[in-house]
Amino acid sequence: LVGSEMCIRDSYWTDFLFQGMFAATAATIISGAVAERIKIFSFMLIAFLYVAIVYPIVGSWQWGGGEFSTFTEDYGFYDFAGSTLVHSTGGAAALAGAIILGPRLGRFNKKGEAAAIKPFAASSIPLVTLGVFVLWLGWFGFNGGSQLAMGTADDAIAVSKIFINTLLAGAGGVMAAGAVTRLSGKTDVVQMLNGCIGGLVAITAEPLLPSPLAAIMIGAVGGIIVVYGTKFLFAMKIDDVVGAVPAHLFAGIWGTLIVPATNSGANFGTQLLGVLSINIFAVSYTHLRAHETSYD
């Protein structure tokens, strides 16, 4: 049945569902960064515009026979499962939204210093941890599913390697983020969890070709980027509630740019061009407007 004419003919709907999950994932990235200071209708509108316009256009550039898909053949732009096409674009839109909306009321004092941490602490660390584990489990579907086939032994072997590299990259992100925060004075569990996401995002651009050790290193750098990216946003007085921008935008850029290190068919210049073009397009469509009444 897998290779039958009926299966091939009707696979459009499977791909539609698969891409719909990618689009929904990107929209949730935006929600995390702008939480607590945007009206529900405003967010529904921006999510609709993103899912209906931004993601289909950006996705088609690489996966739908568009401009960047020709670069794949001629110059070598690769994004296997969406480090840039899904995560960086969502993170770029989230960054624009967080800047336009400004910080939550009381997040920073008049001197620009952080307010008391108590009102802004994570509500439940166990629930945050559970959520990250659910994401980690779902990532096997995202990365493994992007192989788009399981009908041959080669496909099955490829998917199994993708699973292993996805697991190792997430673990690398956790451990690296934990080590960095520990060296700074205290192990930060939330940063470790975000580091896991950063590691997973980083490996998503090319989860098939890296060796297991390379996957760990790619994920580890992604986790470190999350820690220092969070500090950078803090220094810039940008209030990203859940750390979506470092975990998705910054780590996604890293994961896309490092692809040529493990994929000889990729080209750094084209990877950089793709990252810049796609993220600029995503930011240009993020026209959020809010004021203090958005808290009401």
Question: Residues of each region from the PLM?
Answer:
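Conserved small/polar residues in nucleotide/adenosyl-binding loops
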Residues: L1-D10, T286-T293
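Cytoplasmic-side transmembrane-helix entry/capping segments in multi-pass membrane proteins
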Residues: S42-A47, D188-C196
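Structural signal for the N-terminal portions of transmembrane helices
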Residues: A158, I162, A266-V283
